[in-house]
């Protein structure tokens, strides 16, 4: 199957989660999720005193529904109303607290946190919030006590240790802060944080030698991580080692696709400026703790807890652009695009992140079905940044997702015209324009674009599959086409669309046993795709398994295929396939089921 769906996002500024995953072991993440408090967990109805079902139970159930939709503000309101009806209910108290915290309703969250720790003194999230409150008030002994109470579970222990180290630094005791950091385990993920925060604390404390050694160690282990790179480069330039700062940033950029912040920092340093340290106060340092861990959690399956940690970071440091971006990403994953827009709106236009963030706003507007607003925003960005490929690429993707292929092709062509010498990084533009040309039935132009994409990046499975499938469908270059499709399947053997392409190619070439084998596998991988089920039905019919064929066609019909496919399926269910060999080109691309959701 040709899957020509537009890419969902491009050039999103984010904390380097791929690097995070290398030092945050999967076992740790599993332990976190198993050990985490009941953030948005299911609650037994029996735990709610239903003596007043019209009010208490109604608010409770409405809160659960809103919580399931990640509408934390509405859920918090319902749970708070339920709590007012049953103030002694510990389950409702905890849920109300967590939801108020996730919604950044700090006055109410703090009140509930104080109530919660009276019942459950070791409640980690409540103790973290109370620790942050005491820290902001300069009550460092009290903050230390709250953070110490939260040490249960791997992430809580890590967070508590880092937070307590920053408390000691705030109290003017950096040596005690270092001693606390030394208590972290020898695991790679823990040592990453130990080196990173040791360097930050040392810089804030004016201990430049210690900072340099710690940050050098962190950068050596993780040169692709944005925050480590920024911290080390800023340390170097403030230590009058401008050459090291430039070298650090260039090494980072050579190992990554580049980030607006690292590129802007390199430009500033090359221009003779001396940017400030990454963290200039203990409050910023504590915010960095919750930002880094929260962003990692949100990207590794701990979405609800990640949002809470990111809210903590902004409670401590309201002007924190990267935390705003991370929170927006989390809302995007939760499909709360309205909140995503609000988070992005907190990024000032002067920030190096601004253009990338505006592009992501366009995708969020598209997700809210506000397509005209999305296009208007991108058109304005294109006008303001006429030499930047990114807004044109985004416009093409969004137009293609709505099958507005002419507008998509125009956007991609304008983007390609800005590239004097295409490189491997530009393959997706040619692929995307190729798909648009193919849908506009301009095959010569489509073929040229797809070939160009493959020449730029020969291992791109999506291009191999699309071009190979298109050739087979037209009876062209059959040997090369099959080689391409097989290579795509080899690169991504668990991709049902590629396996379907291989099976359908065998079907078109008359190798029915091989076709059935591959199409059965494709249905296993993508049981909810109407096109793949239809393909298996056709192949089953041709080898005489007519009952199975009708079952697959009926299954395909139940999966809401496109209207033109419905007529064909109903006809096949009634009369089967004609005896003559299949010769009609199969433009069953599955694009509708894979439309851009973002």
Language-model segment annotations:
Residues 1-22:
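N-terminal secretory signal peptides that target proteins for export/translocation
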Residues 4, 15, 31-32, 133:
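Absolute N-terminal positional cue centered near the fourth residue
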Residues 5, 11, 35, 456, ...:
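Selective for proline/serine-rich intrinsically disordered segments
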Residues 16-40:
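Gram-negative bacterial Sec-dependent N-terminal signal peptides
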């Amino acid at each position: 199957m040709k899957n020509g769906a537009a890419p969902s996002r491009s050039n999103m500024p984010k904390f380097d989660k791929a690097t995070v995953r290398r030092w945050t072991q999967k076992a740790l993440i599993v332990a976190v999720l198993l050990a985490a408090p009941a953030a948005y967990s299911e609650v037994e109805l029996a735990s709610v005193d239903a003596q007043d079902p019209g009010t208490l139970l109604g608010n409770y159930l409405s809160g659960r529904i809103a919580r399931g939709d990640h509408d934390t503000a509405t859920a918090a309101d319902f749970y708070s109303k339920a709590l007012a009806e049953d103030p002694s209910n510990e389950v409702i108290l905890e849920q109300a607290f967590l939801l108020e915290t996730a919604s950044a309703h700090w006055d109410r969250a703090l009140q509930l946190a104080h109530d919660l720790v009276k019942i459950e003194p070791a409640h980690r999230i409540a103790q973290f919030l109370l620790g942050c409150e005491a820290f902001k008030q300069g009550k460092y002994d009290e903050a230390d006590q709250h953070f110490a109470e939260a040490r249960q579970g791997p992430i809580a222990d890590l967070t508590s240790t880092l937070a307590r180290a920053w408390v000691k630094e705030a109290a003017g005791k950096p040596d005690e802060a270092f001693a606390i950091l030394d208590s972290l385990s020898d695991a790679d993920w823990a040592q990453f944080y130990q080196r990173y925060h040791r360097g930050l604390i040392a810089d804030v404390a004016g201990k430049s030698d210690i900072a340099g050694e710690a940050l050098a160690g962190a950068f050596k282990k993780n040169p692709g991580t944005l925050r480590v790179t920024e911290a080390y480069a800023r340390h170097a330039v403030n230590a009058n080692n401008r050459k090291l700062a430039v070298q650090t940033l260039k090494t980072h950029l050579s190992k990554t696709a580049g980030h607006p912040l690292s590129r802007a920092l390199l430009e500033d340093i090359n221009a003779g400026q001396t940017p400030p340290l990454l963290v200039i106060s203990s409050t910023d340092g504590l915010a960095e703790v919750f930002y880094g861990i929260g962003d990692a959690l949100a990207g590794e399956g701990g979405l609800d807890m990640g949002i809470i940690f990111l809210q903590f970071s902004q409670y401590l440091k309201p002007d924190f652009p990267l935390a705003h971006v991370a929170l927006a990403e989390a809302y995007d994953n939760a499909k709360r695009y309205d909140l995503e827009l609000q988070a992005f709106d907190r990024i000032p236009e002067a920030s190096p992140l601004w253009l990338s963030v505006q592009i992501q706003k366009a995708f969020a507007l598209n997700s809210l079905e506000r397509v005209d607003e999305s296009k208007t925003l991108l058109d304005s960005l294109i006008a303001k940044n006429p030499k930047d490929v990114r807004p044109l690429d985004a416009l093409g993707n969004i137009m293609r997702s709505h099958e507005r292929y002419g507008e998509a092709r125009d956007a991609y062509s304008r983007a390609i015209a800005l590239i004097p010498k295409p490189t491997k990084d530009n393959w997706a533009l040619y692929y995307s324009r190729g798909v648009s040309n193919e849908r506009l039935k301009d095959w010569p132009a489509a073929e040229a674009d797809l070939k160009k994409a493959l020449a730029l990046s020969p291992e791109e499975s999506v291009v191999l599959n699309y071009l190979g499938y298109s050739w087979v469908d037209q009876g062209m270059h059959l040997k090369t086409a099959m080689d391409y499709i097989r290579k795509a399947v080899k690169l991504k053997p668990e991709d049902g669309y590629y396996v379907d392409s291989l099976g359908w190619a065998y079907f078109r070439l008359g190798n029915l046993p091989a076709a059935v084998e591959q199409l059965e596998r494709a249905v296993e991988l993508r049981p909810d795709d109407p096109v793949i089920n239809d393909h298996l039905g056709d192949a089953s019919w041709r080898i005489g398994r007519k009952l199975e064929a009708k079952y697959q066609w009926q299954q395909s019909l139940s999966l809401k295929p496109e209207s033109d496919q419905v007529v064909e399926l109903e006809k096949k269910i009634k009369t089967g396939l004609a005896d003559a060999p299949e010769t009609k080109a199969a433009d069953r691309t599955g694009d509708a089921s894979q439309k851009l959701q973002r």
